[in-house]
Amino acid sequence: MAASVSLNKDFALELIETNLAVVRKDIRRILSRWQVKSSQEMIEMTEKGELREAEVDALALTNLIDKEKELEGLHAFVDEA
């Protein structure tokens, strides 16, 4: 049985934007820790073994990127509603 919830559009957008800000801050923190400029660069360097012991952060980064894309899609959906 599915439940539905009514939510103010502006409030929903604010929640999504706040979550996006947290995700992006976490992405920047990981990139800064490894002194790389982009997520793609870090993932590639980790796969090549150029960043030793970065596997856990690279996996977290991949998950954060997925979450960022999901939130961006949700933001666009809610914004267009």
Regions found by a protein language model. Name each.
Residues 1-11, 46:
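Short, charge-rich amphipathic alpha-helices with coiled-coil/heptad character
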Residues 9, 13-23, 27-30, 61-64, ...:
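Amphipathic alpha-helical coiled-coil segments
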Residues 18, 37, 78:
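Residue-level signal for short amphipathic helical patches enriched in basic/charged
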Residues 29-51:
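Short E/K-rich amphipathic alpha-helical oligomerization segments
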Residues 44-67:
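Short, charge-rich amphipathic interface segments used for partner binding and complex assembly
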Residues 70-81:
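Long amphipathic alpha-helical coiled-coil segments
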